[in-house]
Curated annotation (Swiss-Prot):
Descriptive protein name: Aspartate 1-decarboxylase
Native source organism of the sequence: Bacillus cereus (strain ATCC 14579 / DSM 31 / CCUG 7414 / JCM 2152 / NBRC 15305 / NCIMB 9373 / NCTC 2599 / NRRL B-3711)
Cofactor binding note of this UniProt entry: Binds 1 pyruvoyl group covalently per subunit.
Residues annotated as the enzyme's active site: 25, 58
Catalyzed reactions per annotation: L-aspartate + H(+) = beta-alanine + CO2
Length: 127
């Protein structure tokens, strides 16, 4: 049996742009993608901390070092520049892998720069 587990997360990313007229997806700074091992065209879930909206889309590489987090197409209706979002990527793991698989979590500052890398989450608050 396979289980769907969180394998990567960009925590508290700041939306830099919302582009309604772009063909769907989310554009993410390639440095951020590399930090948590998210690849282009991979499916992600986005949770908007400001309004509670949740959506799924796929990733497009953004310019390295730019800090870009841009929601494109219809998803642009669910965010505003400046909103804080959590970008989550899941993977399928076997029962044997459950206890050895560790997610990569990047906690970001207001400029989408990594301030902390985590391997596992504990209950609590990260601001």
């Amino acid at each position: 049996m396979f289980r769907t587990m969180m394998r990567a997360k960009l925590h508290r990313a700041t939306v830099t742009e919302a582009n309604l007229n772009y063909v769907g997806s989310i554009t993410i700074d390639e440095d951020l993608m590399d930090a948590v091992n998210i690849v282009e065209n991979e499916k992600v879930q986005i949770v908007n901390n400001n309004n509670g909206a949740r959506l799924e889309t796929y990733v497009i590489k953004g310019e390295r070092g730019s800090g870009v987090v841009c929601l494109n197409g219809a998803a642009a209706r669910l965010v505003q520049p400046g909103d804080k979002v959590i970008i989550i990527c899941y993977g399928l793991v076997t029962e044997e892998e459950i206890h050895t698989q560790e997610p990569k979590i990047a906690v970001l500052d207001d400029n989408n720069q990594i301030i902390e890398m985590l391997g596992a989450e504990k209950a609590g608050t990260i601001l």
